[in-house]
Design a protein with these regions (language model features):
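Conserved transmembrane alpha-helices of multi-pass membrane proteins
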Residues: 320, 334-348
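A short beta-strand structural signal in non-transmembrane regions
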Residues: 52-56, 149, 173-176, 199-225, ...
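Hydrophobic alpha-helical transmembrane segments of multi-pass inner-membrane transport and secretion
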Residues: 12-39, 248-284, 307-315
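Hydrophobic secondary-structure segments that place a key small or acidic residue at a functional site
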Residues: 92-97, 107-119, 125-191, 198
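Peri-transmembrane interface segments
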Residues: 39, 211-268, 277-279, 287-288, ...
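Transmembrane alpha-helical interface segments in multi-pass membrane proteins
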Residues: 275, 283-329
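Hydrophobic, regular-secondary-structure patches
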Residues: 27-112, 131-133, 138, 223-226, ...
């Protein structure tokens, strides 16, 4: 083993090149997995296991789901829906639309605008207003998520955003513990319905039960009502987990594909390096044989050298990749066709 360690110091350039190639492969693979896990973590953390989501069965997401006012009233009459401190049912009827905003530095991208009621702050406790104030339900006002505020022009407090033929003033900035809500704008649901001439048709209903132990009873009442056959209910966490599957899966497959390509190059490079290392050390090998070292011992030394090179390269690649956790990037959410900001994240 001393022989192996001395070879590292004696042939520094060869060792550095080999270790760098392996480190690059590990870095790319780790970065792809961190990106996929970051998307999953962001979307899954968006939903709460204590909240129930109601959507139209044929919809691929909130944007394509429609729930009319009559259906909402039927759902409000179902058992086990919790009441807030004000005595009102804890249901948030939410229209969800997509608008275009200008990105800082040029270009346009889609942004989700969600209409909510005052009940939503009891349903989603992770929402924290960090600057400004909440929107006035009687005015065309918005609060924006932290990620939107950082990336888009005119998404700062005091700015006005034009859509649906009107000007909407931004009055507050919120964060949501790194969840997907930070990539949205929120305004009053009735104001949004009025602006888009949707009468009482919302995209989704989010509600809380008096006890999650009653979920099966609630679901049974929901599914046995023939008027609700076109709709489905699931926990909010499960909904967002399903939303993350396609995007995270695509990123993971793409990352593995790129890693395989890099791996071929790194493997060939490592093989050439080890072959040349053996070829250049024929005299040393002969000397060791004459000193009484067996072929097995010499082979073990070279195998240990290759293994050590790979381990060092892997550790360095993973160490460098770990710094990606300090970066936040954004991509297109395939289900909502809007911006989704997320951070690279190492899985447990």
């Amino acid at each position: 083993f001393k022989y192996t360690f001395r070879n590292f110091t004696a042939r520094k350039l060869t060792a550095i090149i080999t270790v760098s190639g392996i480190a690059m492969v590990v870095f790319v693979f780790a970065a792809a997995l961190m990106m996929a896990y970051g998307v999953e973590k962001t979307l899954v953390s968006t939903g709460s296991a204590d909240n129930i989501k109601v959507l139209r069965k044929s919809s691929q997401g909130e944007i394509s789901s429609i729930i009319d006012g009559d259906t909402e009233n039927i759902i409000r009459a179902l058992p086990h829906i919790a009441k807030g401190s004000d005595g009102n049912l804890m249901i948030s009827a939410e229209p969800v639309v997509v608008i275009n905003l200008e990105i800082k530095g040029g270009g346009l991208s889609n942004v989700t605008v969600r209409g909510v009621s005052q009940t939503v702050y009891q349903l989603r406790s992770q929402i924290k207003l960090i600057e400004g104030r909440l929107f006035n339900p009687s005015l065309r006002e918005l609060i924006v998520g932290k990620s939107i505020n950082n990336k888009f022009e005119g998404a700062q407090i005091g700015s006005k955003v034009k859509f649906a033929g009107d000007q909407w003033e931004i009055v507050g900035l919120f964060e949501a513990e790194g969840s997907g809500f930070e990539s949205e704008m929120w305004g009053d649901a009735q104001q949004l319905l009025s602006a888009f001439n949707r009468e009482s048709s919302v995209s989704t209903l989010t509600l809380k039960l008096d006890d999650m132990g009653n979920y099966e009873d609630f679901k049974r009442s929901f599914e046995t009502d023939k008027r609700l056959l076109p709709f489905e209910t699931k926990t909010e966490q499960k909904y967002f987990e399903e939303q993350s599957e396609y995007l995270a899966g695509f990123i993971r497959v793409l990352g593995i594909f790129i890693t395989i390509i890099f791996s071929f190059g790194a493997t060939i490079g490592a093989m050439i390096t080890m072959y040349s290392a053996v070829a250049n050390r024929t005299v040393e090998i002969g000397t060791m044989r004459s000193l009484g070292f067996s072929r097995r011992s010499i082979l073990s030394a070279f195998l240990f050298e290759a293994l050590l090179t790979s381990v060092v390269g892997g550790v360095i690649g993973l160490f460098i990749a770990s710094f990606l956790q300090f970066f936040t990037i954004s991509t297109l959410n395939w289900n909502s066709f809007s911006e989704l900001a997320f951070s690279f994240s190492l899985s447990p």
